[in-house]
Amino acid sequence: MISPSNNCLRRLGGAGLLLLLLGACGILDTTREARPAFYSLYGARPGAISSIAAPRSISAPTLIVNPPHAAPGFDSHRIIYVREPHQLEYFARSEWIDTPARMIAPSIVAALENTSAFRAVVMTPSVAAGDLRLDVEILRLQHEFGSAPSHVRFTLRAYLVDNETRQVLAWQEFDETVAAEQDAPYGGVVAANRAVQNVMERLASFCAKAAGIWAPADSKRHKAGELPLSGQSMANPN
């Protein structure tokens, strides 16, 4: 015969086992935890600046684009926001799908190709040889909450270099601020994409104009009289 005390112990043991199983299910069920949201960054708007560029020609320079890099603090997947000057913070559950520098690289190439100012635009690493080289750096990409509405600020510095002479032909710093439609990570992401698109258009226009005044080193030496032009002799005609 089973005593009432034994029945009570069995019931308590069964209840304890059930609680343990429920606890284990809770640990394994990760759907209850807030998962991070991942966002992308696209900068090229095809057709936006093609009207400003000269038709593509075989004599146009080939442009080599080095992979963009970013200033410290802006070289990760984290989406940065600022509430106080000089203090960078990041959203806990919102991230870029890749680093901003890697995400904007295809957009830079697309925007430059759209100008038709270059014979070809090539992203390194590549075995292709180029006449000009473009180096870019992201100085900041941050969601700023210091005023209402909040806004995203994107700053990019670019150098256009003559590959043969290693001379900097032109450089410029591009700074864009776009208001966010909402004070939330997604609002900042939308504003960031618009800011990057604006900078890509300005960057492409800058490079196209600089390429328009570029001349190969040999051509410059011909004009300066350092080398004879075709059909001329270096000997004294007298």
Where are the language model's segments positioned?
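Short secondary-structure boundary motifs at beta->alpha junctions and helix caps
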Residues: L88-E95, E164-S205
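Extracytoplasmic/secreted envelope proteins and their assembly/folding machinery
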Residues: T62, A101, A105-V109, T115, ...
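Bacterial N-terminal signal peptides that target proteins for export
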Residues: I2-G16
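Surface-exposed short loop/turn segments
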Residues: G26-G47, T115-T165, E181, L229-P237
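C-terminal motif of bacterial Sec signal peptides marking the signal peptidase cleavage site
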Residues: L21-A24
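Envelope-exposed proteins and targeting segments
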Residues: S59-P61, D75-H77, E84, A92, ...
